Amino acid sequence: MRRKSAAMLLCAAVFLSGCGVVSMTPSANLKSTETEESGMKTETTENVIYLAGGCFWGMEQLMQSIPGVIDAESGYANGTCEEDADYRTVCKGGTGFRETVRVEYNPDEVSLDALLLAYFYVIDPTVENRQGNDIGTQYQTGVYYTSDAAKETVERIAAIEKGRSKKFFVEIGPLINFFPAEEYHQDYLEKNPDGYCHIPKAEMELFSKL
């Protein structure tokens, strides 16, 4: 029942965003990110959201399949350690970094509401430090925003989702930092169609047809 109702809400949000009703964020800023010497990216556009949803291969593929998404990039977000993020360091645990996908979108084609509803459709918000078969702090779920407009939307959708579950472990907060993942992680499932993915193919196809 939970997933069925989420799908219905998602379809409604996508339809409304196409009519220019649900889009909650301003028009796109053409410049997206700037990369500092450390490898950390600094956000310079409004129409972006950072989604931690378990293994980033699947979340990246899911977001890329949604019409209106301009780009999805795998990386590591909101670390608390002093080290820069890379796969080996993050997998050791204790860094605070989450496998996260940076999603840039065109608000004239898809709303942030719709992207968040797609996100909550495929994750399990009731478990901590785990999604699917993947266990570890790097697989903790989270939604990280970079603007006041996105904050309002994220908190509104999160409140709805919290009301539908007895437990809710999804981190909700501002983006602190983001390091792009290694090149071999980018577009991983495009390069390896039979590679591991914790999101069922049927759900991928559902959103690609919206």
Give residue spans per PLM region:
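Flexible coil/turn and secondary-structure edge motifs
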Residues: R2, C19-L210
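Bacterial N-terminal signal peptides
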Residues: L9-G18
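Bacterial N-terminal signal peptides that target proteins for export
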Residues: M1-M8
